[in-house]
């Protein structure tokens, strides 16, 4: 599954992307 995190540079994007990285379903993570 591909996931895109909008606003990854902001305060909410970083912890959110960390959570998604730990999730086994997520294979590709794109940050914008």
From Swiss-Prot:
Keywords: NAD, Oxidoreductase, Tricarboxylic acid cycle. One of its GO terms (biological process) is tricarboxylic acid cycle. Its EC number is 1.1.1.37. It catalyses: (S)-malate + NAD(+) = oxaloacetate + NADH + H(+). It is an enzyme of class 1 (oxidoreductase). InterPro entries: NAD(P)-bd_dom_sf. GO terms for molecular function: L-malate dehydrogenase (NAD+) activity. Belongs to the LDH/MDH superfamily. MDH type 1 family. Homooctamer. This is Malate dehydrogenase. It comes from Nitzschia alba.
